[in-house]
Amino acid sequence: MSESNNNQALREEFNRWAEAGRGEGMEEDHLPITLPVLDLMQLAPDDNILDVGCGAGWLERLLSERVPEGRVVGMDISDEMVRRARRNYVALENTMFVIGGVDEIPWDANFFTRAISVESAYYWPDPARGLREILRVLREGGSAWVLINYYRDNPHCHQWGDLLAVKTNLLSAEEWSEQFRAAGFTNVAYERIVDSSPSPDVYTGRWFHDAAHLRAFKSEGALLIHGTK
């Protein structure tokens, strides 16, 4: 499948997610692993931040509070997700939402001081190209932060690839780090962010076999990779 076809498939799939209300529900699932990352980013009040794969915009609300003198741009390939984000957070004066894919970010070079992506990067059709684009729009000294739950070193998430309707990239921490370095990032490092939120006694969803499987997955932690331009 070509990159344009991959992007179209992603757009259609995440439009369906948006219409089902799944965009708004992502905050509950992702907040416990995202808050520690925001602390690690050491945001300044005047930072300009790009969120790649913003969904329905929940992270923009948190970011806008932390950078009151800066700008927050949420980008998503799903036009329906962006429509909902604009509706949900119309009152955020320093925030805007744009439709776009990471392979061709609709923004000028050297603008952002930080870029973040939460649970989006493994959907990118070409991670290397996406990271090069993020590097392009970052200022010198800016940093990129990619947070994912689906990665090769956590065996308890591998089943997701068969459950998702779109192509995914299951890479290891070392492979992601090499992608960062190949794109031109320096000071590349990675770590695990453990989800310490309570787990249910009984699990009836489709992503894990049972509650014990979910707990094992959470104990491995999400993978955070970051680097500097």
PLM regions: where:
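Conserved class I S-adenosyl-L-methionine
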Residues: 1-44, 58-62, 81-84, 88, ...
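Class I SAM-dependent methyltransferase SAM/SAH-binding core
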Residues: 48-104
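A short acidic, Gly/Pro-enriched loop at the edge of an enzyme's catalytic core
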Residues: 103-115
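A short SAM/SAH-binding and catalytic strip from SAM-dependent methyltransferases
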Residues: 114-126
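A short glycine-rich, Lys/Arg-flanked "PGG" loop and its adjoining helix->strand segment in the class I
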Residues: 128-140
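Conserved beta-strand signature within the Rossmann-like core of class I S-adenosyl-L-methionine
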Residues: 142-148
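Short, glycine-/aromatic-enriched active-site segment of Class I SAM-dependent methyltransferases
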Residues: 149-167
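Short alpha-helix
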Residues: 168-184
